[in-house]
Amino acid sequence: MDASSISPDHAVTVEPLLAERIEVLRGPATLLYGGGAIGGVVNVVDKKIPTAVPEKGIEAEAELRGATGTKERAGAVGITAGEGQFAVRVEGMKRRTSDYDVPDWPGGKLEGSYSESTQGSVGMSWITPRGYVGLAFTHLESKYGLPGHNHEYEGCHPHGTHLHCGGHDHDHEEEGHDHDHEHEHGGVPYVKLRSNRLDLRAEYQDPFAGFEKIRVRGGLTDYQHDEIEGGQVGTRFKNKGYDLRVELQHKPIAGWRGVVGVQNAYSDFRAEGEEAFLPRSKTRSNGLFVLEEYQLNDWRFEVGARQDWQRISPSGGASRSSLSGTSLSAAAIWDFAPQYSVALSLSRSQRLPNAQELYADGVHLATNTYELGNADLGRETSHNIDLTLRKHSGDTTFSASVFHNRVKNYIYANTLDRYEDFRLIEYTQRDAEFTGVEGELRHQFTPVFSAAVFGDYVRGKLTGGDGNLPRIPAARAGVRGNVTWQQWSGGVEYARVFSQKDIASYEDSTPGYNQVNAVVAYRGRYGATGYEVYLRGTNLLNKLAYNHASFISSVAPLPGRSVLLGVRMTY
């Protein structure tokens, strides 16, 4: 719970360096966490609350790494100790990066792309043979620049559907101009962030008749970040709230296994200062969900359902939004031959608008936009079909997927007008559709060497031939080779990211680029300590590249060449 959903320049308070694993959930399983995740859900699993007492009384992990192009210096450590029925977890992380290198760019660096972050947590659990209950407190402090934050547009304001900037209307001939990065560099604003969170987690086996397990997850969050320019706090964002979910895993019923659960969340969001483009808003949400699975010979069936209720109460006299949404999903996986399977997923999902989409009204200089919300927005409804063919074992494996989504009343940021790199956007609803393919083919040529080809493509447009949707990622294709020999492993990957010319009104096309990445690693043991030393290179061709999906792609290109050296240890 932070401010990342309000703007792409607001950091997510999740630290990958301390994550145990990162999962991507698709199909009916996404309904465990929300009804509007058309493309899937990213679930970060951490170890801040122990779930078991270490067998030898203590376990530890540590990682150190440093990079060239970003000047990253980072370290993380986690220690779990336990005795009897109690276990304690302590972990910490510190990272610092400088403005990263960019080829063919004024000064050779992207001004304002630096970051600093420090995080620490302490967790404790009471553990029994049938489950555990634990608490953890996490404190995060972060500071990062805002690249592309341009105060030349401070005087821009809307007049109907047009922009007025610098005492004159915008020139409509600006539409579709090429990338131009000859801009003035002044003092770059930055964000200073603080977050405190208290987490509760509990699991218990066989809690009562008919159920195998109960899981409880909850948290209290106190989040604040200041946007600072010239030593003065220009905007302060605050978010306080809680989230709670309870899942019950039932015993098999006529062969069906699954979970039912409830979710409740509350947040009180405030934005104060010159960029406070949102009123204070209180959001209350509740959800009921069920996910079931059935195995029948070579077939596996999954079904899921979710009902959501959301109420957003803004200050300042704006109308309250009170909406509900119903989402349904089903999938069938058929292992039709040894090593082969085909999966078909169908879903009907509903997403409810957030406070930004409903109530925004003001200049947002971090994204070079003036944002207009629409308090009359309703739910969006998506009908999705996804077909996947896999060969999952043998020397040759592959996965190929095709999907099509039709969305009624799709909510998106529509650009009404543009002056240079500044846009007037309004959150609106239109019917839209998305079509995409992705695939990978891999072959194990020898016990040591394997190679793969991969690619993905998505097309997003308004229905009825009314134009393209903005910020749709460009198509990508590539090839990678991997080597594994004794304790060594390594790989090289080449990817071609194609130009994006299917653009919306007032949007620039983005040129394509080539990217080469490589990694080599060595794993070993020293007594009771396992270790891995790795060397990773990114954008080794040092190509100037833009991310079309970014609001500020033309003024904030991707990093240039960087080489990272790191070591990871476990005890």
Label the model's feature ranges.
Residues 1-52, 71, 387, 551:
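Acidic, small-polar-rich N-terminal luminal/periplasmic segments of exported/outer-membrane proteins
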Residues 5, 49, 60, 76-191, ...:
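Periplasmic-side early beta-strands and strand-to-turn transitions of outer-membrane beta-barrels
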Residues 64-70, 83-85, 94-98, 128-130, ...:
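Transmembrane beta-strands of outer-membrane beta-barrel pores
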Residues 132-134, 138, 192-335, 341, ...:
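Face-selective signature of the C-terminal outer-membrane beta-barrel domain
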Residues 165-199, 320-321, 327-331, 335, ...:
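Outer-membrane beta-barrel signature, preferentially recognizing the C-terminal barrel domain
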Residues 258, 399, 403-407, 425-503, ...:
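Gram-negative outer-membrane beta-barrel transporters
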Residues 350, 406-408, 499-501, 522-571:
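C-terminal beta-signal and adjacent terminal beta-strands/loops
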